[in-house]
């Protein structure tokens, strides 16, 4: 994990092509144009998009933000964590998660939540291996607009 820490940085607009590819690998197809439009989030002080660089390009990213709700103290929440297929199992996911935790602590947050699709077993095993614990099971509903 330590070897990756020096390769993690804040995202830039020119990362859009790689972020689109990585998002698609995760199962959320996105075009470069769509990602460029979404990168307006880089201006949000309560959000951080961290990218890991490798010799062969962008190896992964993590999207973390402050979640503010009426019913509890603010907490950090991971919106997405993607490690490119060639880099899985090399400690990059743990390094990205540690960087997101550092970012959250620096903002005085005491919790970092990560939601993982119940159908994806691999991420569950990863999160438990790096010390995360399950705090709730839930369903996500979408209301048609």
Please tell me what each predicted stretch does.
Residues 104-116:
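Conserved GNAT acetyl-CoA-binding A-motif
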Residues 4-6, 10-74, 79, 84, ...:
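Acetyl-CoA-dependent GNAT
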Residues 25, 89, 102-106, 133:
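Conserved amphipathic alpha-helical interaction elements at protein-protein interfaces in regulatory
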Residues 80-83, 89-102, 125, 129:
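Conserved acetyl-CoA-binding loop-helix of GNAT-fold acetyltransferases
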Residues 47, 136-140:
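Short hydrophobic/aromatic beta-strand or adjacent loop that forms the aromatic wall/cage
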Residues 30, 73, 91, 122, ...:
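Residues that form or flank phosphate/diphosphate-binding pockets in enzymes
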Residues 94, 118-137:
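Conserved active-site alpha-helix within GNAT-family acetyltransferase domains
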Residues 114-123, 142-145:
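Conserved beta-strand-loop-alpha-helix junction that forms the acyl-donor binding cleft
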């Amino acid at each position: 994990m330590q070897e990756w820490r020096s390769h993690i940085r804040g995202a830039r607009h020119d990362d859009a092509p790689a972020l689109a590819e990585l998002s698609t690998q995760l199962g959320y197809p996105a075009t470069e144009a769509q990602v460029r439009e979404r990168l307006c989030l880089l201006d949000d002080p309560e959000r951080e998009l961290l990218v890991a660089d490798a010799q062969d390009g962008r190896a992964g990213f993590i999207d973390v933000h402050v979640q503010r709700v009426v019913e509890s103290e603010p907490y950090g929440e991971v919106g997405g964590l993607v490690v490119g297929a060639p880099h899985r199992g090399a400690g990059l996911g743990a390094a990205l998660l540690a960087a997101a935790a550092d970012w959250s602590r620096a903002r005085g947050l005491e919790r970092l939540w990560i939601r993982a699709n119940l159908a994806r077993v691999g991420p569950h095993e990863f999160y438990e291996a790096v010390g995360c614990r399950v705090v709730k099971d839930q369903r996500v509903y979408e209301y048609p607009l």
